[in-house]
């Protein structure tokens, strides 16, 4: 597991009035819940699936703090601290193919991994699962599977040759599930309808479920369906979920 990680801090409280000098709610914090976020959340989810894994991530601290109404789960505000980190302090070529059954990359674009770093990682293992905020291109064509979300796909769909991403590209569609690029076009994988309570970390849970099931079955269709189910369960719970 390689990528940018953070501390996900959820501050739950109440708000019953507006500030008298400005139209803003007065928030009274009651409790904090702190989780390992971003690549750290994928890592915790992978361990939750009983996978043995290592984590390579940033040493600098990134904090995402959300102020949330205890009763309604409405988020009043998110405050990000330390949004950028230094480049990874390791040489990607030091990771040997025989050491790992798969490499999972969660690239949140905070500066920990460059395109060159990811390209090297993709070339040294046949099972690289990439989730990236970068614009996909030749640098990541050797990844086994690449997951991006709908806004990221919409931003690039007119600038890429979809034939380059056959049997590789997975686009998540929120509550509609996801789609997987095939030679004849996208295959759609709908998800079951659930009551959405919190979207935090759902993509991380999807990625971990995808990896876990694929390592078990080597069947990407089964893996996508399982990942959809994992994400659907995650959004029904408060905060970042690392154990289903």
Which ranges hold each PLM region?
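A secondary-structure boundary/capping signal
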Residues: 2-3, 149
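Short beta-strand/turn micro-motifs composed of small residues
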Residues: 3, 47, 57, 132, ...
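Active-site metal-binding loops of divalent metal-dependent hydrolases
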Residues: 4-5, 108, 205
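Conserved N-terminal subdomain of the carbohydrate kinase-like
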Residues: 7-105, 115-117
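Conserved beta-alpha-beta core of the PfkB/ribokinase-like small-molecule kinase fold
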Residues: 16-22, 67-82, 102-161, 177
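Catalytic cores of large soluble enzymes that bind and process phosphate-bearing ligands
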Residues: 31-38, 109-113, 145, 152, ...
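Short hydrophobic/aromatic-enriched beta-strand-loop microsegments
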Residues: 53, 145-150, 187-190
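Conserved phosphate-binding/catalytic region of the ribokinase-like
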Residues: 98-99, 116-142, 155-244
